[in-house]
Amino acid sequence: MSDQQHSAPQNAAATASPSDSPEAVEATMAAHAADELGRLQNELAELKAKSADLADQFLRAKAEAENARRRADEEVSKARKFGIESFAESLLPVADSLTAALAIKDATIEQLREGTDATLRQLTSALERNKVLAIQPGAGEKFDPHQHQAISMVPAEQEPNTIVSVLQKGYVIADRVLRPALVTVAAPK
């Protein structure tokens, strides 16, 4: 409230002439007080309306944030549940090939070998399409503990801590090691 608003009743008394009766001065002050009261009530009503509007906006924003969080949780859940769908679809031809191979009653060893090779190519292709790549280091490569697991150290005519042989391939998916390659490593001399 400004100084001007506080001084309104006092100004009413000051503007009253000395010839005015105390009742007239009192009536003038009451009229000014009533005007001030009306103005304050209007201001209060405006502030209450503004407060109610802000409270409503807050509740709407809160509800929207909660809905966004819930939608994000649902999307994460769906991604976990169906994220493997593409990978599973790429493995179906492999399963079909194995089923067809088992259905052949009198297959020769050559037919089995050709079928197995074709199935392995299908499997390798499915893995590569899904960013699953083999870790298959060559002999003489430097041992990398992040991608290789040393099974043993053997004396060898090569530089120490280099790979002598690969016992089992490893695999990575998008720079994350699924399984390290099992290797033997050249022992220090």
Curated annotation (Swiss-Prot):
Cellular compartment(s): Cytoplasm
Classification via InterPro entries: GrpE, GrpE_coiled_coil, GrpE_head
GO CC term (a single one): cytosol
Quaternary structure (record): Homodimer.
Family annotation (SUPFAM superfamilies): Coiled-coil domain of nucleotide exchange factor GrpE, Head domain of nucleotide exchange factor GrpE
Function in brief: Participates actively in the response to hyperosmotic and heat shock by preventing the aggregation of stress-denatured proteins, in association with DnaK and GrpE. It is the nucleotide exchange factor for DnaK and may function as a thermosensor. Unfolded proteins bind initially to DnaJ; upon interaction with the DnaJ-bound protein, DnaK hydrolyzes its bound ATP, resulting in the formation of a stable complex. GrpE releases ADP from DnaK; ATP binding to DnaK triggers the release of the substrate protein, thus completing the reaction cycle.
Matches recorded under NCBIfam families: PRK14139.1, PRK14140.1
A molecular function (GO) term: protein-folding chaperone binding
Keyword Cytoplasm tagged: yes
Pfam families, A to Z: GrpE
Gene: grpE
Protein name per its UniProtKB record: Protein GrpE
Similarity section: Belongs to the GrpE family.
Primary site of residence: cytoplasm
PANTHER family membership: GRPE PROTEIN, GRPE PROTEIN HOMOLOG, MITOCHONDRIAL
GO BP terms in the entry: protein folding
Compositionally biased spans, kind Polar residues: 1-20
Region (Disordered): 1-29
Keyword vocabulary terms for this entry: Chaperone, Cytoplasm, Stress response
Matching Gene3D superfamilies: 3.90.20.20, Head domain of nucleotide exchange factor GrpE
Organism annotation: Paracidovorax citrulli (strain AAC00-1)
HAMAP family in the cross-refs: GrpE
Keyword field contains Cytoplasm: yes
